[in-house]
Amino acid sequence: MFKQQKKLVFVIIATIALAMAVACYIKKPKRYAVFAGYNPDGTIHPYVITYLKGLNEVADGVVYVADSTLKPAEEEKLKNLTIHYENIRHEEYDWGSYKRGFNWLKDNGYLEKADEIIFANDSCYAPLTSFKPMFKAMAKRKDLDFWGVLQNTRFNPHVQSYFMVFKKNVFSARQFQHFINAVRHQVDSSLYITEYEVKLTPYLENFGFKWDSYMPYQELSYLADSEKNSYPLTLVKKYGYQFIKRRIFTSSLLIYEDTDKLLRYVYELNPERYFDIASEIPEWFIPDDLKEKKNAR
């Protein structure tokens, strides 16, 4: 009897030890996000709330920095979704917000605790369902030091700046911090792309940091335009893309696919996300059958 009890105790201890080892192995990285916003009317729109909630599912805290002012009553919307928020016109676009959010994390001790940081902005409706599968997939890419959702080859291969993730060895490097803190006001908005988005990837790559995108860019080579966001239905339906660029519903982004089919697919995928989008876009983009659903809501 004593031997059996001793054996049972040994098995229990071994099981607990194994469980603890597995738990340590799969421990979620501590992650903080900087979200860059812009509110010309001084309000927080529903799609932004959705985005912040999505980030909170994969991050331990979100810093919200807007390049605009905010009506005092609107700040209530941010209090339970952020660890810090700033709303001031700094005139450095999203990159100025990234800079300010990054430095707040640094000055308040969060970077010391962080394994990863996210830079994201409000140029997309996201997530369509959840960011979790994307982060689970990219966690397997142990070779990467930083990554983006999608890359572009215009000018040079680079991750697009509306969603980027950096591991500790990158964001703690003086080269990265120098680049971020060198962000300045530009006389034309296109310069934020050519000076910062286009240059960051090769700049970090030059120091030996490895990168890639969640969307398999080489596999997408059959889509002719280097801006793959011009094929939103393909990305969402075939590749599980969690983002829809807001510019799709303007004249500033060339689209090669049917937006009616896109909206119908989003409605089937996640009706609540569809309604977020429908409340923001011009009425004439919405197919008649979906207008009825919107009006009946």
Map each language-model feature to its residues.
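Short, low-complexity, Lys/Arg-enriched N-terminal segments of secretory-pathway carbohydrate enzymes
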Residues: 1-2
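ER/Golgi luminal nucleotide-sugar-dependent glycosyltransferases, focusing on the catalytic module
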Residues: 5-10, 21-297
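Bacterial N-terminal signal peptides
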Residues: 15-17
